[in-house]
Amino acid sequence: MPYNISVVKGRSYCPSCNKQIRWFDNIPLLSYIILKAKCRDCSANIESKYFIVELVSALSFVFIFYLFGFTSTTILFFILSISFLIIIFIDLKHFIIPNEITYTLIAIGFLKSFDPTLNQYLFPNYINSLIGGGVGYSIIWIIIFVYKKLRNKEGMGLGDAKLLSALGFWFGWISIPFILFFSSIVALGFALPSLMNKSKTMSSQIPFGPYLVLGCVLYLLLLEQIILYLN
């Protein structure tokens, strides 16, 4: 991770005063509201991103559980939604997508493809999964290669290639063109206003990971319509 801080071991602490956060000040959503977004010890402001992550996580979990109930699919989507949130906030701030996240998603995506009890429309078999992973990585790699040849500088990063590969492992090769299309449309929608008011230029660095995530979410939300269209 960017700060080389374990998210598994150790307790949370305030980045301003380095004091450990008490358990009753670490309750998702409630603590942020009760403390009025300030550290109890040093009164430093607590970034709103923590509240946003907790809120989106809670809403995602409720929505996923509503759709799938007590099933292995629910657990898989819990893992995916947490990973998506981590990717979005890290890529937006640091312009990187941690290998720890993408490699874990690739491993889970491939291993779950051997489970015949999972919905085959949602999760592909291992052959489809393997092809999806390869196609996802190859497409971004080709884009990077061509852009560098034409512009003589880096465009997208290999982190994006690994992320699209992971999504291919999860949802198969058929998902790749839809995810790329949706993510490109969303990215264009966000980038155009900045380009028009000249706060960004065509050479500005733009993290594409969050748009791949949003593209994947749109693909999943529209999956039923996509299947009907393809059939």
Locations of the language-model features?
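Juxtamembrane boundary at the C-terminal end of a transmembrane helix
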Residues: 221-231
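Functional transmembrane core segments of multi-pass inner-membrane proteins
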Residues: 79, 86-186, 229-231
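Hydrophobic transmembrane alpha-helices of multi-pass small-molecule transporters
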Residues: 58, 113, 164, 188-195, ...
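Transmembrane helix-loop-helix
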Residues: 64-76
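Select subsegments of transmembrane alpha-helices in polytopic membrane proteins
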Residues: 48-55, 101
